[in-house]
């Protein structure tokens, strides 16, 4: 996400401050997990990892993510960059992918049919690794 949102930034601390404790409850974590559309067999690992994140770290991570923007010099990048975005992702994520693609001259963008955010690398890990190996082997 490369579209900063000051409003989102300002809402993260009060929202997570008031409901952070809920992540320790499995019923709540299952609701979160379901919304992420991750394979069900990964829930135990997700729950363990989520419970290990300190409140201050979670807030800091989410706040920084909400105000991230591309640096002015990004256009000077000489790397060939692959950009994957799910067809079913939020518009802000699709727009961010397009912005990155437009700023990077040698970038390639692919919209992945019927996929949500993170689904390619998590739920289709074999395909994701195969794609990475193709990229590495082309060098």
What is each residue range found by the language model?
Residues 112-129:
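Catalytic histidine-centered segment of alpha/beta-hydrolase-like enzymes
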Residues 1-22:
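Flexible "cap/lid" loop of the alpha/beta hydrolase fold
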Residues 74-78, 102-105:
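Short, conserved loop/helix-junction motifs that constitute active-site signature segments
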Residues 44-71:
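Hydrophobic, aromatic-rich cap/lid helix
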Residues 76-77, 83-85:
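Short beta-strand/loop motif that positions the catalytic acidic residue
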Residues 90-96:
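Conserved alpha/beta-hydrolase "acid-adjacent" motif
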């Amino acid at each position: 996400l490369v579209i900063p949102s000051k409003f989102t930034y300002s809402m993260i601390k009060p929202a997570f401050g008031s409901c952070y404790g809920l992540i320790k409850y499995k019923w709540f974590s299952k609701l979160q997990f379901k919304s992420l559309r991750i394979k069900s067999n990964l829930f135990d690992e997700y729950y363990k990892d989520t419970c290990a994140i300190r409140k201050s770290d979670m807030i800091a991570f989410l706040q920084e993510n909400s105000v991230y923007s591309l640096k002015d010099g990004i256009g000077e990048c000489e790397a060939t960059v692959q950009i994957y975005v799910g067809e079913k992702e939020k518009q802000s994520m699709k727009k961010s992918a397009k912005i990155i693609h437009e700023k990077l001259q040698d970038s390639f963008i692919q919209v992945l049919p019927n996929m949500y955010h993170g689904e390619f690398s998590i739920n289709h890990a074999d395909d994701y690794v195969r794609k990475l190996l193709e990229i590495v082997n082309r060098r």
